[in-house]
Amino acid sequence: MDESNSQFEKRKRDHIRIALDPRSQTDGQNGLDSITLIHEALPDLNFKEVDISTSFFFSGESIPLSSPIFISSMTAGHEKGREINEALARLSDRRQILMGVGSQRRELEDSNAAEEWARVRKQAPKARLLGNIGIAQLIKSPIDKIRRLIDSTEAVALFVHLNPLQEALQPEGTTDFKNGLAAIENLVKLAGVPVIVKETGCGFSVDTLKRLSSTGIYGVDVSGKGGTHWGRVEGYRSEESDMLYHVAQTFANWGISTKQSMLNAIDARVEYQLWASGGVRNGLEIGKLMALGASKVGVAKPFLEAALQGDEALEKLLTQLETELKVTMFCTGSRNLKDLQSKKVIQ
């Protein structure tokens, strides 16, 4: 179903409003509470030596990053979203972390929408941005249009998000996912930047992770259940008298947890990079996911909340997350991220 610009902007405003509503959250369902990291009472290192720096490496180019934490995709394509993205991009610029932008779907049909990123880039010329398009749009769009999305953000990589539940529950949803695997494979060949496939809060099965191995993608962000549930978000956009409201209630806890999605990736023995997100709320959870094999870990809702408060709140949040990660590493005897990923720290 086609929608006007005003309808699109209202939908995106609804998404922000409802994503901040506790009813949209599957708190406590990411599975990470059941993981215990082994405490090291006598770490052979100085806390000041703990190093959380990393990089984004592709085709011989290495982009330095201050930490493995990335800002997970939330919103784009409307005035409030622009303000949020400007604040997040400034943080990415200042602190050298990756930032996933919200869906760039609108830019496929509205060339003026790309101006949002030109304004963002003026404020944050060194922001490390990750472009973002949905699989349903990728399937139907010529590759030159997708490349324009990448160019508009000057993205270092492109997320392709998979969101079947959200699309099925969205009145304006696009639910034709046929030939999606072939579309991803074609994109990998022609995009010119790394392609990372992500879910949007419902996670991945072993089978899907194995199927993606044939496409040549750079990585997968498992984006499991445990945080903002976009099925719930779409349900709460509907009136209680609407059928879709009640259908969404049926699927309010649908999905594979973040922890289980990571375990599924281990079982699938994938060779592409594993990133993780989905209900991540603190640096200890980031450490747990790194120990499970994640090379980057995304945080969404906390960054959205902080962005609405301003730059100082964003700085405080990121500093806290990074400090919690460092404490996790110190107390497991991990000098750097490689140590954390390679040690048997899971009990």
Curated annotation (Swiss-Prot):
Keywords of the record, alphabetical order, are: Cytoplasm, Flavoprotein, FMN, Isomerase, Isoprene biosynthesis, Magnesium, Metal-binding, NADP
Residues binding FMN, per UniProt: S72, S73, M74, T75, S103, N132, K198, S223, T228, G279, V280, R281, A300, K301
> What's a single GO BP term from this record?
isoprenoid biosynthetic process
> Known InterPro entries for this protein?
Aldolase_TIM, FMN-dep_DH, IPdP_isomerase
Record Pfam families: FMN_dh (PF01070)
Which GO cellular component term is one of those annotated? cytoplasm
In short, the EC number is 5.3.3.2
Q: Which co-factors does it depend on? A: FMN; NADPH; Mg(2+)
Question: Quick one: which residues bind substrate?
Answer: R11, K12, S103, Q104, R105, Q166
- List ligand-binding residues for Mg(2+): E167
The protein's job, in short, is: Involved in the biosynthesis of isoprenoids. Catalyzes the 1,3-allylic rearrangement of the homoallylic substrate isopentenyl (IPP) to its allylic isomer, dimethylallyl diphosphate (DMAPP).
Quaternary structure and interacting proteins, as annotated: Homooctamer. Dimer of tetramers.
Record-given protein name: Isopentenyl-diphosphate delta-isomerase
Report the source organism: Bdellovibrio bacteriovorus (strain ATCC 15356 / DSM 50701 / NCIMB 9529 / HD100)
